[in-house]
Swiss-Prot record:
It holds the Pfam family DapB_N. Homotetramer. GO terms for molecular function: 4-hydroxy-tetrahydrodipicolinate reductase; glyceraldehyde-3-phosphate dehydrogenase (NAD+) (phosphorylating) activity; glyceraldehyde-3-phosphate dehydrogenase (NADP+) (phosphorylating) activity; NAD binding; NADP binding. It comes from Saccharolobus islandicus (strain L.S.2.15 / Lassen #1) (Sulfolobus islandicus). Signal peptide: none annotated. The keyword Chaperone does not apply. NAD(+) binds at residues 11-12, 109, 167, 300. This is Glyceraldehyde-3-phosphate dehydrogenase. It comes from the Archaea.
Length: 340
């Protein structure tokens, strides 16, 4: 049983903490919070131990939230830390993890240099075995890598061109925008996503562009893949249908908008309406000779959660990629095939 700490209990952290509680080989030591907001109250209500910075203890106690100790205490009590702090903050915490000689999993908001390896479970699990510091790539990069590495099983992927329509903010982020604008992210080519993909697949020819849209629900990707050999559409659809963490969306559902997909998640009683699988619209899959085009939706709040669970096992050498991915998927109810 591996003892896991989660530093940060926001959008990703609370989902990772809940995922750890569902694993048969992991124990959640507790979570770290810096402010006694509603998420801290809910964590306490769930019975999760809360650790805080030394200077914040009084603030939490005055709010009526018991404190189990400092963040340093949390790190010391764990075997490995999943750092889900805001972008750039994880690098500031790394010296603490080093001080107590603890392995750590970082998120895609950190620079790749913070870790020994950037990670995508379907692409490079074996390369991450035993690595002390692993960086799970961002939500968009996770979706790109899942898709690319899956299609690479049909025949070698030689070139990728992708356009990413990014959601402007998560649903709880009331101070972010835009409200009524499309914002190039950035207005130069390539966007950072290409470099991030190359942190996992070193020599792939990939160019990405991105734009921020006034929505909070999901991202959308439009990608063009050039393969080494000619392929048939049925072979591409088959590999997508039979790969875990990818689901196909049929036009028969009459649910192709991201808002409708969220409603599907509600009706399926998905926790927090999460869909951690890449959602590929099957009618969008276009194949001509060695060229493949497709579009898919990405639920940014949950797609990296199973990757974090697998990264814990890879870092601590708990088990093989196949076993870890299977156990993670089973415990979290993650599908393959068609969503409905």
């Amino acid at each position: 049983m591996i003892s896991v700490a989660v530093n940060g209990y926001g959008t990703i952290g609370k989902r990772v903490a809940d995922a750890i509680l569902k694993q048969p080989d992991m124990r959640l030591v507790g979570v770290a919070k810096t402010s006694p907001n509603y998420e801290a109250f809910i964590a306490h209500r769930k019975g999760i131990k809360i650790y805080v910075p030394q200077q914040s203890i009084k603030k939490f106690e005055e709010a009526g939230i018991p404190v189990a100790g400092t963040i340093e205490d949390l790190v010391k009590a764990s075997d490995i830390v999943v750092d889900t702090t805001p972008n750039g903050v994880g690098a500031q915490y790394k010296p603490i993890y080093q001080q107590f000689q603890r392995n750590a999993i970082f998120q895609g908001g950190e620079k790749a240099e913070v870790a020994d390896i950037s990670f995508s479970a379907l692409c490079n699990y074996d390369e991450a075995l035993g690595k002390k510091y692993i960086r799970v790539v961002s939500c968009n990069t996770t979706a790109l890598l899942r898709t690319i590495c899956t299609i690479n099983k049909v025949t070698k992927v030689e070139k990728v061109r992708a356009t990413i329509v990014r959601r402007a903010a998560d649903q709880k982020e009331v101070k972010k925008g835009p409200i009524n604008s499309l914002v190039p992210d950035p207005a130069t080519v390539p966007s950072h996503h290409a470099k991030d993909v190359n942190s996992v697949i070193k020599n792939l020819d990939i160019v990405t562009m991105a734009v921020i849209a006034p929505t909070t629900l999901m991202h959308m990707h439009f990608i063009n893949i050039t393969l080494k050999d000619k392929v048939e559409k049925k072979d591409v659809l088959s590999v997508l249908e039979n790969t875990p963490r990818i689901v196909l969306i049929s036009s028969k559902y009459d649910a192709e908008a991201t808002a409708e997909l969220v409603e599907v998640a509600r009706d399926l009683k998905r926790e927090r309406n999460d869909i951690p699988e890449v959602m590929v619209f099957d009618d969008s899959v276009y194949v001509k000779d060695n060229e493949v085009m497709l579009m898919y939706a990405v639920h940014q709040e949950s797609i990296v959660v199973p990757e974090n669970v697998d990264a814990i096992r890879a870092s601590t050498r708990l088990m093989s990629a196949e076993d870890s991915i299977r156990i993670t998927n089973e415990s979290l109810g993650i599908l393959k095939g068609y969503l409905i």
